[in-house]
From Swiss-Prot:
Stored SUPFAM superfamilies: Nitrite and sulphite reductase 4Fe-4S domain-like (SSF56014), Nitrite/Sulfite reductase N-terminal domain-like (SSF55124)
Protein's UniProt name: Sulfite reductase [NADPH] hemoprotein beta-component
Record: residues binding [4Fe-4S] cluster: 434, 440, 479, 483
HAMAP family attached to this UniProt entry: CysI
Recorded name of the encoding gene: cysI
BP GO terms, sorted: cysteine biosynthetic process; hydrogen sulfide biosynthetic process; sulfate assimilation
Binding sites annotated in the UniProt record for siroheme: 483
Enzymatic reactions: hydrogen sulfide + 3 NADP(+) + 3 H2O = sulfite + 3 NADPH + 4 H(+)
Family to which the UniProt record says this protein belongs: Belongs to the nitrite and sulfite reductase 4Fe-4S domain family.
Length: 569
């Protein structure tokens, strides 16, 4: 490496060097894939692989036993598909379902960003899996990494025309902000190789080192905030007048991740800075992204998210810098009102079509002896003439069903015992968990495998106090990275150690306020003992229509938090 290149990365996080020297995300990934000695790839390449939509993981349930046997960890890979707005055709679903059968343990995991991911893919099957995604006319480019992640939008089963428009916007923003490197096609799809500097790849928007950290964009359409718009780096809030989408309020600087022992880190809610016409969304997102590219902290990844750039520079500075880059000014924000951040479960109707939102607990699609969920959805895909939409709450919408086809869809739903969640408590319907153990390397505690059981024990308390039908959001993550957006929930648990969680209360049912630490590093017994008197008090003293999160704030059980800088104080 030349001396001036050494100077280029001096004082920066080492990942900046890795990205900059990677030849636009190639690194030595191909060599690693072809190495038969290990199930892993090189450490630097694992960082680059994220930009291709994949993480290297290992089965943590087996780590100790394999160590005893003097074996390397059971390495496998997760692939996350890029699906802006979460919409797939039934033909695409069938191909993605087959991928799970062939390479991923016959399971699909719906994510909190309206896409799907596969776990347990062995290195020898990684390229074949990527090609299977390509066969479904999809890809996994930028599903992970320091780039714009999967662009979300409100599925709006009851406002189909508006949904179609915001889904097109999500598609267009995603395509516009996609990395331009040809590395993905070269490595996974046997595209033409860039072999010398005379034909060097390029990244006109991102540059060689891409963004300082991941960058998330989502479009919400009031009254539903199901995408948790305030958790996004850029949130676009659709403004509808006379049944027509006229534009978006723009929110900046949201983000959920933090680190337990780094008090400089915190979750944050985005702040609205103005209104834009709908045809300006792509341009505005690009300019905001370039502000983060130029001013985000590349020396400390714990301070590299856009939320810290916004808080460090100030909202007024961000708005002025955006106006300067655009060459025109944002308008004053328009009024809007959110009602909730959940899904419309069961049958809904809009624009002459019917839509059924299927409740899928924590997004896990697999067959068990008693519940053939994966098979059921495959059977639906074989006969359904509309499309499927993955929701931000890890559920699945069977969308665009004609009146004449409703009985056939309902018959499959009934035959397989599928549910709209209405047979469950309001708490379970609004529950969400990240994957955590055994595949996530960051997990400090269980999440997906534990939350259903904990919810069952909390349901006993809800039954006791007559609260079973109350809609209450509850979320759990195995670490503080925030994949299930726990800091926005009315009740949340963030893993601290095996069996131990930080317990938070006071988020908003609308998703527009952060919760607050109530008790630290506690287990199940203390969780239930702590919740009992609060739920009892809520049952007796709540005002009409008052949500649980609002109640605990009004009663002073926790402080109201509307800015992440007050989250820890």
């Amino acid at each position: 490496m030349a001396k001036n290149d050494n100077e280029l990365y001096k004082g920066l996080d080492d990942l900046e060097r890795n990205k900059g020297e990677s030849n636009y995300l190639r690194g030595t990934i191909v060599e690693g894939l072809n190495d038969p000695i290990t199930g892993a790839i090189a450490e630097d390449d694992t960082k680059l692989l994220k930009f291709h939509g994949s993480y290297m993981q290992d089965d943590r349930d087996l780590r100790q036993e394999r160590r005893k046997q003097k074996l390397e960890p059971l390495y496998a890979f997760m692939i996350r598909v890029r699906i802006p707005g979460g919409k797939v055709s039934t033909d695409q679903w069938l191909k993605l379902d087959a991928l799970a059968d062939n390479y991923a343990g016959e399971q699909i995991r719906l994510t909190t960003r309206q896409t799907m991911q596969y776990h347990g893919i062995l290195k020898r099957n990684l390229k074949k899996s990527m090609q299977s995604i390509h066969d479904a006319v999809l890809d996994s480019i930028a599903a992970c990494g320091d780039v714009t992640r999967n662009v979300m939008c409100n599925p709006n089963p009851y406002q189909s025309d508006i949904y179609a428009e915001v889904n097109r916007a999500a598609d267009s923003i995603s395509e516009h902000l996609l990395p331009k490197t040809t590395a993905y096609h070269e490595i996974w799809l046997d595209g033409e190789k860039v072999v010398d500097t005379k034909k060097e790849d390029h990244e006109p928007m991102y540059g060689k080192t891409y963004l300082p950290r991941k960058f998330k964009i989502g479009i919400a359409v009031p009254p539903s905030n199901d995408i948790d718009v305030y958790s996004q780096d850029i949130g676009l809030i659709g403004i509808v007048e006379n049944d027509e989408l006229i534009g978006y309020n723009v929110s900046v600087g949201g983000g959920m991740g933090m680190k337990h022992d780094d008090l400089r880190t915190y979750p944050q809610v985005g702040k609205v800075i103005g209104f834009i016409p709908k045809d300006k969304a792509e341009e505005v997102c690009e300019k905001i992204l370039t502000i983060q590219r130029d001013y985000g902290d590349r020396s400390d990844r714990m301070q590299a998210r856009f939320k810290y750039t916004v808080d460090r520079k100030g909202l007024d500075w961000i708005k002025q810098e955006l106006n300067d880059r655009l060459g025109w000014e944002l308008e004053e924000a328009k009024s809007f009102e959110f009602e909730d951040n959940g899904d419309r479960l069961g049958w809904t109707e809009g624009s002459g079509k019917h839509h059924y939102t299927l409740f899928i607990q924590n997004g896990r699609i697999k067959d068990t002896e008693d519940f053939k969920l994966k098979t059921a959805i495959k059977e639906l895909a074989k006969v359904h003439k509309g499309d499927f939409r993955m929701t931000p709450n890890q559920n699945l919408i069977i969308a665009n069903v004609d009146e004449k086809d409703k009985p056939e869809i309902q018959k499959i739903i009934d035959n397989y015992g599928l549910t709209d969640g209405k047979n469950y408590s309001g708490l379970r319907r609004n529950s969400m968990a990240c994957v955590a153990f055994p595949t996530c390397g960051l997990a400090m505690a269980e999440s997906e495998r534990y939350l259903p059981s904990l919810v069952g024990k909390i349901e006993d308390l809800l039954d006791e106090f007559g609260l079973s039908e109350e809609e209450i959001t509850i979320r759990m993550t195995g670490c503080p990275n925030g994949c299930a957006r726990p800091a926005l929930a009315e009740i949340s648990f963030i893993g601290k150690a095996p069996g131990k969680y930080n317990f938070y209360l006071g988020g908003s049912f609308k998703g527009d306020r952060l919760n607050k630490l109530y008790k630290e590093n506690i287990g199940e017994k203390e969780i239930l003992e702590s919740l009992r008197p609060i739920l009892e008090q809520y049952s007796k003293e709540r005002e009409k229509g008052e949500h649980f999160g609002d109640f605990v704030v009004r009663k002073g059980i926790v402080e109201k938090v509307t800015d992440g800088r007050d989250f820890r104080g």
